[in-house]
Amino acid sequence: MQNRNTFSWVKEQMTRFISVSIMIYVITRTSISNAYPIFAQQGYENPREATGRIVCANCHLANKPVDIEVPQAVLPDTVFEAVVRIPYDMQLKQVLANGKKGALNVGAVLILPEGFELAPPDRISPEMKEKIGNLSFQSYRPTKRNILVVGPVPGQKYSEIVFPILSPDPATKKDVHFLKYPIYVGGNRGRGQIYPDGNKSNNTVYNATAAGIVNRIVRKEKGGYEITIADASDGHQVVDIIPPGPELLVSEGESIKLDQPLTSNPNVGGFGQGDAEIVLQDPLRVQGLLFFLASVILAQIFLVLKKKQFEKVQLSEMNF
């Protein structure tokens, strides 16, 4: 009887342990997968500072190119493509959080004029859906539907990102006018060098926090190093912790300076930003332009016909 109770207790504890483990796995997996776009969203009300700098550059320190392509002009209540290109060498591998090498991911933030927003699914054509692929876009804030973020997504598949955009209609939105508007974009490839809390990631260079002699270098079991430096000023020891990923550049017994790089810089990615302009075109203005062009063409035709008629009259008078 006692053995049976013991078995039941063990079974109950094992079931509880497995359930808790599954819950922790699901929660952590979700938070990790959704973390990247949220970094900027949690820390900044607007991703574009007053200076024009996009805040993603605070974590992605290397400067890399990005390109955006939009139509020169669009009509109201029209779906169009905003194509963001984030070029990089597909052969490159980045340092992952565990110190291993892996493929680069990409992400982008698109800052549209007020009134422009992500097109609803039922307004997107099958051809455009095919270009978009399995990308999932979200608004930067529920109240800022004109600012869209996406990523991280595999860079090898999505180095070109197609945003489906719906233009506003001034007839229904009184704060929107038929004008030329700017569009801003930021795009990154690879992991950042600094987390939003100010701590370094393992995808950056680590510098010495003291000048002196490297007394000891201990390789940690899970990767990374502990570097003990004997301070040159008073001899006290300073320990610098290097996470897995960066390659060590110093050795024991070496004399180093303050802020001297202890590791290589493993970062192969970077962030870039760009801009474009788009005109919200008045349909009546387009119709007026077409009418004007048609009238000019008709006037030219009548002028040619009149000239030929005049030449015929002159020719008949000369023959007479």
From Swiss-Prot:
Does Amino-acid biosynthesis show up as a keyword for this record? Answer: no
Q: Which residues bind heme?
A: 36, 56, 59-60
Q: Which stretch is the leader sequence?
A: 1-35
The record's InterPro entries line, in alphabetical order, gives: Cyt-f_TM, Cyt_f, Cyt_f_lg_dom, Cyt_f_lg_dom_sf, Rudment_hybrid_motif
Q: Where in the cell is it found?
A: Plastid, Chloroplast thylakoid membrane
List all membrane-crossing ranges. Answer: 286-306
The record's Gene3D superfamilies line, in alphabetical order, gives: 2.40.50.100, Cytochrome f large domain, Single helix bin
Q: Tell me where on the tree of life, at the top rank, the source sits.
A: Eukaryota
**Where does it sit, as one GO cellular component term?**
chloroplast thylakoid membrane
Which biological process, per GO, is one annotated for this protein?
photosynthesis
Principal place of residence: plastid
Q: What are its cofactors? A: heme
Keywords, ordered alphabetically: Chloroplast, Electron transport, Heme, Iron, Membrane, Metal-binding, Photosynthesis, Plastid, Signal, Thylakoid, Transmembrane, Transmembrane helix, Transport
Q: Which GO terms describe its molecular function?
A: electron transfer activity; heme binding; iron ion binding
Record carries keyword Thylakoid: yes
What is the role of the protein in this entry? Component of the cytochrome b6-f complex, which mediates electron transfer between photosystem II (PSII) and photosystem I (PSI), cyclic electron flow around PSI, and state transitions.
Summarize subunit and interaction data from the UniProt record for this chain. The 4 large subunits of the cytochrome b6-f complex are cytochrome b6, subunit IV (17 kDa polypeptide, petD), cytochrome f and the Rieske protein, while the 4 small subunits are PetG, PetL, PetM and PetN. The complex functions as a dimer.
Homology family: Belongs to the cytochrome f family.
Under which name does UniProt file this protein? Answer: Cytochrome f
The organism of origin for this protein: Liriodendron tulipifera
Query: Source gene?
Result: petA
